[in-house]
Structures are given as structure tokens and as C-alpha cells.
């Protein structure tokens, strides 16, 4: 069009050939493929906010929070999907992916079932935001097949999924520098694996009575407090349904 307005008439194919020969590129932005994917996946299937920020009222393995975060490394970006027990703060399942297709979110649910299926039932709630992955037919059908209850935050209200958001914040604070130095996707996977293993087993939290998430789960399951020998170290424990 610019040439036409200056009085020059030229075939489009010739223009493209000359641009290629001179390494010229059109500055017009191309559509983000993930935005198109999000539009294609999005449905009107928004679940009720059953949890409504009552993260601890149901007990362990009853309210499971899920979300996706971006991890930027030297060669690009990858995506982490996690499922967190709102009561014990354990990461029960996670998947890393180099793309945002819905498959890796469904794979996270499948890992949850493989690893913890015997502790879950038809009262287990999977709570998420209203992202296109969680409103997709594939995800909804996966939860329905597993006999889980689906719950969603209100649109744009991050506090409705606060423990999951907090987990991502702490994780990124700890590993951001290390991730930024990673050259390959496999290196990011190793860093994520190591940190989540550390978090579940060795990251002690005041809100969990100075225990790690896995220790806290065992304490709630057995009633045996591992720090009982240290006088005054025990706080008042919540009384979730076990």
C-alpha cells in the first residue's frame, strides 16, 4: 500500500521476493498462537466457587488447588502445573511443559490419581481459576470421570486461590536466579524436581506447626507429633476431618 500511494505499481510476489533477498521483515505483529488456543478452548462452563476461601474447613485431601505458572530460563519459557492440598500444603502432583496445550494440565490430574487416588473420593474438590484450561471440555470431563467436584475462583480474584498463588511466589523467590541460568528445558525440569522435593519434605512452616508439608500430613493422619520431645515447640493444631 505504501508503494501504491507513492505511485509505484509492483506485483506482491515481487515485493516479497525483494524483501527476502534484502532480509526485510514486515513489522506487523502476528497473532499470539496461545491466545488463539485460549479462545478455541474457552467455554462457558464456569463452576461455582464452592471453596469460597474456606481452605481449611474440609480437612486434608478434600480441597486441592491447581494453577499454572511461567518459568523463564535463558533459552525460553516453560510452564508448571501443580496441584496443592490446601490443608497440608503438599504438592501432590505437578507437570512441566514447553507448551500451553491442555494436555499437561490433564496429565497433572492423572498423576494425582496415580499417586494419591486411594486417599481421594467423590467429595474431593479441585479448585482453580477460570483459565481456559480449567473451563475446557477435556479438563471438565477428566474431573467428571474421576468423580471429583469442580470449583472455581471468581474472575480476576487471586485471593480465591491464595495458598496456590503463595506457593508459586515462594518457589520463584527461591529458584528464579537458578532458573534464569538454565540453558535447556531439561535443566529447568531438574531444578523444579529438586525444589518441589525439598518443599514437600524439608521446608518447615510456622502455619504447619513447624513441620514440613509431608510431616504435617503424617501428624494429622496419626496424631503423633514429631517434635513432641522439645518442650514448648508445639502449637495448637487445627482439627480437620481425618
Where are the regions that the model predicts?
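Acidic/histidine-rich, metal-coordinating catalytic segments
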Residues: 118-135, 209-213
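RNase H-like polynucleotidyl transferase catalytic core
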Residues: 28-34, 125-130, 144-163, 179-184
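Active-site beta-loop-alpha junctions of metal-dependent nucleic acid enzymes
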Residues: 76, 95-119
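Basic, flexible linker segments flanking DNA-binding modules
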Residues: 1-59, 157, 212-222, 227
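C-terminal domain-tail junction helix/linker
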Residues: 137, 144-148, 170-242
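An active-site-proximal beta-strand-loop segment
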Residues: 53-92, 98
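Mobile genetic element proteins and their domesticated derivatives, centered on retroelements
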Residues: 15, 19, 51, 67, ...
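Conserved, non-catalytic sequence blocks in retroelement Pol enzymes and Pol-derived host proteins
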Residues: 5-8, 56-57, 73-74, 129-130, ...
Amino acid at each position: 500500500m505504501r508503494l501504491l500511494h507513492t505511485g509505484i505499481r509492483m506485483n506482491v510476489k515481487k515485493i516479497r521476493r525483494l524483501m527476502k533477498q534484502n532480509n526485510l521483515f514486515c513489522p506487523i505483529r502476528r497473532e499470539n498462537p496461545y491466545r488463539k488456543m485460549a479462545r478455541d478452548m474457552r467455554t462457558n462452563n464456569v463452576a461455582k466457587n464452592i471453596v469460597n476461601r474456606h481452605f481449611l474447613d474440609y480437612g486434608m485431601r478434600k480441597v486441592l488447588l491447581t494453577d499454572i505458572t511461567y518459568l523463564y530460563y535463558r533459552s525460553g519459557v516453560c510452564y508448571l502445573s501443580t496441584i496443592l492440598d490446601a490443608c497440608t500444603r503438599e504438592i501432590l502432583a505437578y507437570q512441566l511443559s514447553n507448551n500451553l496445550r491442555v494436555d499437561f494440565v490433564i496429565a497433572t490430574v492423572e498423576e494425582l490419581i496415580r499417586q494419591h487416588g486411594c486417599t481421594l473420593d467423590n467429595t474431593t474438590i479441585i479448585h482453580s481459576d477460570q483459565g481456559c484450561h480449567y473451563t475446557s471440555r477435556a479438563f471438565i470431563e477428566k474431573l467428571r470421570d474421576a468423580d471429583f467436584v469442580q470449583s472455581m475462583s471468581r474472575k480476576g480474584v487471586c485471593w480465591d486461590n491464595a495458598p496456590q498463588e503463595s506457593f508459586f511466589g515462594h518457589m520463584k523467590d527461591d529458584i528464579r536466579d537458578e532458573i534464569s541460568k538454565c540453558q535447556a528445558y531439561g535443566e529447568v525440569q531438574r531444578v523444579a524436581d529438586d525444589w518441589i522435593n525439598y518443599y514437600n519434605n524439608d521446608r518447615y512452616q510456622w502455619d504447619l506447626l513447624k513441620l514440613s508439608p509431608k510431616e504435617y500430613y503424617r501428624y494429622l493422619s496419626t496424631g503423633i507429633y514429631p517434635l513432641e520431645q522439645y518442650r514448648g515447640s508445639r502449637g495448637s493444631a487445627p482439627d480437620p476431618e481425618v
